C-alpha cells in the first residue's frame, strides 16, 4: 500500500506543472491542457464531462476558467467539446467568422482582466462559411449587418490572394482562414490594452489555431503560446 502511495505521488509530481498567476496556482499549463484535451477529442477518448450536484453547486458560486477562447458561431465547432473541457473551464466568445466587435472585445477584456485567464486563443475552423462568403463580396449581396461582418474578414482574403498567386480557390480559403485568426488576434491586441500589459508581465499567453474536421485536431500557429 505504501509503495502504491509513493508511486502515485511521484506521478503527480511528474505530471503536475504549477505556475502562479495573480496568486492563484494553476495545476496544468493552460496551453498544454487545451492540447491534451484536443488530443483526447481527436482520438475519440473524450472524458465524461457530466456534472454532479456538488459540482453544479460549486459552479453556482463562481467561475475560474483557465482560457479565454474566441471562436466562430458555427454549430459544428463548440470549443468545450473540441478541447474536451467541462463547465467552468473555458470563457468563450463566439461570433461568425471568429470576428470581434465592441461587445466581444469587452467580453475578452473581462475574461483576461477580471477572470484572469492566463491564456487567450483565437480559433478558426476549416470550411468556414463566413470566410468563404468574404471572397468576391458584392454590394447588396447580403444584408447590411452581414456585409459589415464580412468586410472585417476581407483583409485576410486579400492577403491570401496577394501573397499566393496561382493557388486554387480552395487553397486560398484555407490560407485566409488561418490569416483571419491571426488578424483577429492582432486586432484584439491593438484594441484591448490589457492584452499587451498582461503579456509584458508574463501573465498572459496568446495563440491562434484552426480546427480541422477530418482529423479532429486544432492546428496551432505555434507550439508555444
Predicted features and spans:
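Catalytic core of membrane glycerolipid acyltransferases/transacylases, capturing the structured
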Residues: 76-93
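Short glycine-enriched loops at secondary-structure junctions
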Residues: 71-76, 96-99, 125-128
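Bacterial N-terminal signal peptides
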Residues: 9-21
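Divalent-metal-activated hydrolytic enzyme cores
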Residues: 25-64, 87-88, 97-116, 129-225
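Conserved functional hotspot residues or short segments at active or partner-binding sites
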Residues: 122
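Positively charged n-region of N-terminal signal peptides that target proteins for export
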Residues: 1-5
